[in-house]
C-alpha cells in the first residue's frame, strides 16, 4: 500500500487560501452608523439663532458701527440706527429708553462718529451719522467683539493757553495788572521771581517792602503832642497832664528798632525839650557846646530864673534837684515854677550827648546835617 504526499507548492497554496478570504471579507463588513447619531451631527452644523432673552455680546459702539456699515448709503439717522438694532437683536425691543440714551451718548462723545447735516434742511429733522474714514478698521477683520485702540488725532490747545505766550499776554499785562518780563519766558513756571511795579503794590499783598527811612523822633512827636502839652502847661506845672504827655513821647520812639535808643521814663511835670518848642517859645538859644568830650549832668531851671553856669571838670555828684543818666527815676522833682510862667525849658550842656531824649536826630547829625536844617516848630 502506497501513501501519497502533497507537493510543497500545493501545500503553500492551501495555507494562503484562508488568509486571502479573510482580507476580502474585512472591507465588506463596515460597522453600520446609527441614524440617531447621524441626525445629531447634521444639527450641530446648522447656524444658531440669537436668543431674544439674552443680551448680545456687543458694545454700543459696535452696534452703531454695524448699523452704519450695513446701510446702503453708509450713513443713518438716529431713528434709523434704532430700527436696525431692534430688527437685528430682539433683546432691545424692551427697555428702549435706557439703551437709546446710551446710543445717543456714544454718538456724541465718540470721535469715530461724525455728524453730517441734511442737505437743504426742510421739514425733516435730524442729522445723518457716519463713520470717520480714519476709524474704518477699528474692528479687527470684521470682529465686532474686539476693538482696536485708536490714536486720537492731535488737537492744538485753545488760543488763550498756548506754549510760548505769556500768561498775561505779550506785554505781560492783563486787566491793568502787569508782571515785568512775564511774556518772555512762557508762563513763568521755571523763571526767576519777578517783582511787581511800584504802581501796582497794595497793602493787602503780602510782599516784603523795604522800611522807609526814620524821620526825626522829636519832629514826629511834636506835631501830635503840641496841643496836649500846651493845655497841660497852661493848667500848671504840677498837673499830672504834663508828665503824661512827656512820658508818652518816649513810647513811639522806642518801637522803631535800632534807629532810636529812647527808653520810656517818667519825667517831672513841665519838663519839655526846648528844641521841640513845647511849653511856649524858648527864652534863649542853647549855649554852645564845650570843647571837652566828657558827659555832664543835665540841669533843670525855671524859665524866669537865669540859667547858671554849666559844671566844669571838678564838678562832683549832681545836686538833689538834678536828673542824671544813671538814675533818671530817683531824681527829686524841681521847685515849682511861678503860675504865670509858660513852662519849664529843658536845657542841655551839649546837644549831641542827650542822655534822656536820645533820638535819631543826633545819631545822624554828622551825616544829614547838610540836608536837614534844625528848625523849631
Curated annotation (Swiss-Prot):
Biased composition (Basic residues): 291-301
Coiled coil (residue ranges): none
Keywords recorded for this protein, A-Z: Differentiation, DNA-binding, Isopeptide bond, Nucleus, Phosphoprotein, Transcription, Transcription regulation, Ubl conjugation
Post-translational changes noted in the entry: Sumoylated with SUMO1; sumoylation is required for transcriptional repression activity.
Position(s), cross-link Glycyl lysine isopeptide (Lys-Gly) (interchain with G-Cter in SUMO): 25
DNA-binding region(s) from the entry: 55-149
Disulfide bonds: none
Single biological process term from Gene Ontology: embryonic eye morphogenesis
Record Pfam families: Forkhead
Region of interest: Disordered: 1-54, 277-338
Phosphoserine: residues bearing it: 34
MF-aspect GO terms: cysteine-type endopeptidase regulator activity involved in apoptotic process; DNA binding; DNA-binding transcription factor activity; DNA-binding transcription factor activity, RNA polymerase II-specific; RNA polymerase II cis-regulatory region sequence-specific DNA binding
Composition bias, Pro residues: 305-322
Localization, UniProt: Nucleus
Task performed by this protein: Transcriptional regulator. Critical factor essential for ovary differentiation and maintenance, and repression of the genetic program for somatic testis determination. Prevents trans-differentiation of ovary to testis through transcriptional repression of the Sertoli cell-promoting gene SOX9. Has apoptotic activity in ovarian cells. Suppresses ESR1-mediated transcription of PTGS2/COX2 stimulated by tamoxifen. Activates SIRT1 transcription under cellular stress conditions. Activates transcription of OSR2. Is a regulator of CYP19 expression. Is a transcriptional repressor of STAR.
UniProt subunit comment: Interacts with ESR1. Interacts with UBE2I/UBC9. Interacts with SMAD3. Interacts with DDX20.
Protein name: Forkhead box protein L2
Taxonomic source organism: Sus scrofa (Pig)
Taxonomy of the source species: Eukaryota, Metazoa, Chordata, Craniata, Vertebrata
